[in-house]
Amino acid sequence: MDIACGIASLLTVDCISVSRISHPADRFTVGEYIPVVIRSSDKENDRIFVTHRELLGTWEENAAAFSPSETVSGIVRSIEDYGIFVELAPNLAGLAEVKPHVHVGDIASIYIKSIIPARMKIKLVLVDAYPGAALPPPARKYFVDTGKVTHMERWLYSPPGCTKIIETVF
């Protein structure tokens, strides 16, 4: 990633969003302008590490857009023995029970059973999956004004009272 004047930087997959993705193409297109925050630098090896996920908002900010009993669309991001992770927003995913004939990348119709901030959990019911279907690319919502913020010291993704802490210290 070129951050200006030919200065290269590294944006790793885990710094793109809190919701896990398998490849940067799941989130970005070649040549796209991507707002980032400088995470760290390695002057000895002339490397700059950047991050994007902090600009996409906290768990609480993202979860505020959803309500229990609501049916929404999402993208199946991973399938595990214990459930299917469905991305509701770039920084928010929930877990649904395993269902046959569902594949990673499918667009899914999702019923929100419950939202549990203290555990950063969203329980989902997968209503239906649509293999090969495509959602229009969502307009990314940034919770930090990238035109005004010039310095971040700490970013806390976890809601108050949550025992699991996800944070970035710059």
PLM feature segments, named:
Residues 1-170:
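Single-stranded RNA-binding regions, centering on S1/OB-family and related RNA-binding modules
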